[in-house]
Amino acid sequence: MIITLRGTPGDDSWCTRLRTEVSDDLLALGAPGLAVNVRDATVGDSLMTLTTLDPPVVGLVAIWTQQSYGPHVTGALDRLRGECDRVDAYLVTESVPLPPPATAPGARTPGFANVALLRRPADLDAETWFARWHVDHTPVAIATQSTFGYVQNAVVRPLTSGAPVVDAIVEELFPLAATRDLHVFFGAADDADLGDRMNRMVASTSAFGANRCVDTVPTSRYVMRSPFAAEVSQ
């Protein structure tokens, strides 16, 4: 499941507290996996920021758990509600076409994680939308960008009352310089290459509506507890 945290951006002390004190409290609940993403000063000036929600998303918490309505989830929501203006949770299914690099527990993942909240257009049925997103778009995204980690979360349903409509939450890892340089973001050799890569991406995202009504949140990513033991650095 993924929890979105919404509030006023720019509070680095909040970001630090979320990935330390608050994360310790969440770890104590015993969930098999926990990751925290924060929109901190390291990524705050990113060019890759799009916002439709008010207040905007300033952090996300991912919890791997066997029970979406069990104490791992209810305890986390209770703890997080006092930390920001709005807390919403979504049950998701995770696909990982490009696994992120393993990190030590609590260490910052290299680069930055660009998190996108996607909505399925009303004129696309679910089967077509998933096919265009997963089957058609995935190889284009990997080929045209400098991505070194790619996680796709399809939303099954919201877990909190009144949660904004979100149909997918995508996390892509990029070099940190990509927050300020489109050439780095797209892995382009020159202006002509950049134009070609951008055109291919626009055509691909337009096919499933990811070019509109989307939020993109630049974040620093911290895996506090990996649910996959083989991924944990020794």
Annotate each PLM feature.
Residues M1-Q234:
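Macromolecular interaction modules
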